[in-house]
Each structure stands twice: as C-alpha cells, then as structure tokens.
Curated annotation (Swiss-Prot):
Disulfide bonds join 2-18, 9-23, 17-34. Transmembrane segments: none annotated. The presence of a 'disulfide through disulfide knot' structurally defines this protein as a knottin. One of its GO terms (molecular function) is sodium channel regulator activity. This is Mu-thomitoxin-Hme1c. Gating-modifier toxin that inhibits mammalian and insect voltage-gated sodium channels. It shifts the voltage dependence of channel activation to more positive voltages. It shows potent activity on Nav1.4/SCN4A (IC(50)=103 nM), Nav1.5/SCN5A (IC(50)=268 nM) and Para/DmNav1 (IC(50)=555 nM) and lower activities on Nav1.2/SCN2A (IC(50)=1447 nM) and Nav1.6/SCN8A (IC(50)=3504 nM). Expressed by the venom gland. The keyword Membrane does not apply. May be interesting for the development of therapies to treat the periodic paralysis hypokalemic 2 (HOKPP2), since it inhibits I(GP) leak currents of HOKPP2 p.R222G/W channels. Negative results: does not inhibit Nav1.1/SCN1A, Nav1.3/SCN3A and Nav1.8/SCN10A sodium channels, Kv1.1/KCNA1, Kv1.3/KCNA3, Kv2.1/KCNB1, Kv4.2/KCND2 and Kv10.1/KCNH1 potassium channels and Cav3.3/CACNA1I calcium channels when 1 uM is tested. Keywords: Disulfide bond, Ion channel impairing toxin, Knottin, Neurotoxin, Secreted, Toxin, Voltage-gated sodium channel impairing toxin. GO terms for cellular component: extracellular region. It comes from Heriaeus mellotteei (Crab spider). It is found in: Secreted.
Length: 35
C-alpha cells in the first residue's frame, strides 16, 4: 500500500499522499508534505 512517512508526499497507484489532494514544499523541513 501507500506509505507517506511523517506527512511526506508519496505517489502510489496514481494518487499522492495516500489520498491527499496535493503536496506543498516545506522550506523548514526541506521536503514535500501532504496538504
């Protein structure tokens, strides 16, 4: 299944973030997070 650790964005079976609609870039964490 889809796994998005620590709210990071993941792509699995045509969906981002285990069902989240989109992702945004977090400068503070230096990674993309689920929105």
């Amino acid at each position: 299944g889809c796994i998005a650790k620590n709210k990071e964005c993941a792509w699995f079976s045509g969906e981002w973030c285990c069902g989240a609609l989109s992702c945004k870039y977090s400068i503070k964490r230096n990674l993309k997070i689920c929105v």
